[in-house]
Amino acid sequence: MRFSRFIIGLTSCIAFSVQAANVDEYITQLPAGANLALMVQKVGASAPAIDYHSQQMALPASTQKVITALAALIQLGPDFRFTTTLETKGNVENGVLKGDLVARFGADPTLKRQDIRNMVATLKKSGVNQIDGNVLIDTSIFASHDKAPGWPWNDMTQCFSAPPAAAIVDRNCFSVSLYSAPKPGDMAFIRVASYYPVTMFSQVRTLPRGSAEAQYCELDVVPGDLNRFTLTGCLPQRSEPLPLAFAVQDGASYAGAILKDELKQAGITWSGTLLRQTQVNEPGTVVASKQSAPLHDLLKIMLKKSDNMIADTVFRMIGHARFNVPGTWRAGSDAVRQILRQQAGVDIGNTIIADGSGLSRHNLIAPATMMQVLQYIAQHDNELNFISMLPLAGYDGSLQYRAGLHQAGVDGKVSAKTGSLQGVYNLAGFITTASGQRMAFVQYLSGYAVEPADQRNRRIPLVRFESRLYKDIYQNN
């Protein structure tokens, strides 16, 4: 017995050393100083095929969305829909609504201005021509900050990082055009479409064409209150306007201004004030409503396209639904942790979950923990229908043009979530091998940096690394 245990232990050590040696060969393809944590395991197996620093904590980046999606399906269900309503507790007499009109925003990340227009049209058709009261923008479904802890300040005005507020219209993103002045030294000017309720100021200096100063005089945007923005920096003279897009910073103010304009366009007047309602109130009579697509459809978009807005509104909604409190980042984090432990049997231990999208630099997770999540997904995919929502290598989403996987010959064989931040290239998902086995894998690659002169070709080492790694996984399992 002792001898057999010795042989088993020796065999395990040999297997591990071979694994480590093989992974070290892959790592030689990466830039100096890159950090890799990697785990590969057959679905349903008790031990990994490759275990390389699988307990090492790393930034998950957008692989975080896998956890968010699983917790959402368990807590909210695939048929859950975000709902936006127009409500009142008053009565309509001779075309006059005697009481306040409440626009209750339910954090629908897909709500559009046209949807608000349609709800206002329904209100008009119900016989309301005048409101004897206030118009309230109800955002009570969420509370606290709309920006998660650990989001970089310089991303805040970018549309991919638009605050996932209770009130979202057209993804809380707007576009402008910046025109250089005819004369160098004069201020460039901005044009904003009238249907965007924002105010833009230009402090952008026009430079002569080819000016050396342009290299270090960068455009920047400074957000202010009530969706006022100041654009600073320089713009070399150009014949065409420069298109730009920015994230709305105050979702409630933005949505309120849009609703106010749509009421005006519909010929509905009111005697009161446009106000924000943040405290939870009993609902009134619903006079118009709009529902989103089912959650499963939204999660598919979220995972395929790595949609941060959907991920973070869903994350906060999970906290709201789990604890019956306004959705906050902390409520979402605690809810996800509890759901995974109690209903999926996955204890995420010392994992740090700060948001649902993976944008936060506070997030930390080990490959071994993510592997538990993937194993649960694979073993319950008949009821979850999860793997089909992931990007498919060579075909769609963020894996459609993943060169390393294409060179590995695994197009159509890999379904996985990507995760990218500065110096981070992650993958978490599944590969169907040449023998027909389904393997789960977690690749957390960070500290990836190249020389400034190599920036144009910075992904070449990544392509070499991934092509060799996934070709071997595909062929040898």
Curated annotation (Swiss-Prot):
- Carries keyword Protein transport? no
Q: Where in the cell is it found?
A: Periplasm
Q: What are the BP-aspect GO terms? A: cell wall organization; FtsZ-dependent cytokinesis; peptidoglycan biosynthetic process; peptidoglycan metabolic process; proteolysis; regulation of cell shape; response to antibiotic
Q: Which UniProt keywords apply?
A: Antibiotic resistance, Cell cycle, Cell division, Cell shape, Cell wall biogenesis/degradation, Hydrolase, Peptidoglycan synthesis, Periplasm, Signal
Chain positions covered by the region annotation Absent in class-A beta-lactamases: 90-263
Catalytic center residues: S62 (acyl-ester intermediate), K65 (proton acceptor), S306
Q: Which GO terms describe its cellular component?
A: periplasmic space; plasma membrane
- Which positions bind substrate? K417
**Function comment:** Not involved in transpeptidation but exclusively catalyzes a DD-carboxypeptidase and DD-endopeptidase reaction.
Designated name of the protein: D-alanyl-D-alanine carboxypeptidase DacB
By which gene is this protein encoded?
Answer: dacB
